[in-house]
């Protein structure tokens, strides 16, 4: 029995790697912000967009032939055919530097995406904050959702069968100053819901730690203020 053995040495340590589902195509991101693609399970490799600084990539969790390469500017690259071809679009701002997930995807429509980026963060800006936009055409046109956010995502999930147009945002109550200096308790993080693509907004919680989706449940961690009253006689 004959086996083929090929060795490829990447020029920097691997930071991220993932296959396209049910495919022989794999993406690898290196420490030097380069991305390589193999379409034959690693037998041969090709560097993608060598002139770009690529900070991360995302596979679409609901559409297995789609992936997105996030650069350090407002440009991102995407494929809709398992990496056979790549195109680019422009996001409304650079990817956020607050640790939030840059892209969120909808199970309802492959073209519905949410982008969370930096706004006003150049130099020593006093109003640096995260800003979320959504697109219904895979990034060709963007609409502002909310400023001063920590996270915005589609409410619907595979098992959480709510209004597919509803969006949830963790949004700071006071929208001024640099978000980098917000401390827990000083500026409440509200959970805001919005149906009809966030046009009909409503506050769900006044002060939250965060939310997550698990199966058919939406789980929210709320901040509870505890008051101690002492009726003491000295």
Predicted regions and their residues:
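Extracellular glycan-interacting surfaces
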Residues: 1-234
């Amino acid at each position: 029995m004959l086996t083929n053995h090929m060795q490829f040495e990447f020029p920097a340590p691997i930071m991220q790697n993932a296959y396209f589902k049910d495919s022989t195509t794999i993406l690898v991101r290196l420490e030097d912000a380069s991305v390589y693609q193999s379409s034959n399970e690693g037998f041969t490799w090709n560097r993608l967009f060598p002139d770009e600084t690529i900070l991360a990539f995302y596979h679409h969790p609901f559409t297995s032939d789609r992936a997105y390469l996030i650069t350090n500017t407002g440009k991102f690259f995407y494929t809709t055919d398992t990496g056979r071809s790549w195109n680019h679009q422009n996001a409304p701002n650079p990817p956020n530097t607050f640790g939030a997930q840059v892209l969120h995807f909808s199970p309802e429509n492959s073209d519905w995406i949410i982008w969370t980026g930096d706004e006003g963060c150049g130099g020593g800006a006093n109003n640096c904050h995260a800003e979320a936009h959504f697109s219904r055409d895979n990034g060709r046109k963007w609409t502002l959702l909310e400023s001063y956010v920590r996270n915005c995502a589609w409410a619907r999930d595979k098992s959480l069968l709510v209004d597919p147009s509803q969006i949830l945002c963790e949004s700071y109550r006071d929208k001024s100053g640099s978000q980098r200096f917000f401390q827990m308790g000083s500026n409440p993080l509200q959970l805001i819901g919005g149906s009809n693509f966030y046009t009909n907004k409503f506050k769900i919680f006044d002060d939250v730690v965060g939310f997550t989706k698990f199966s058919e449940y939406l789980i929210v961690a709320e901040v509870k203020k505890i008051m101690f009253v002492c009726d003491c006689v000295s």
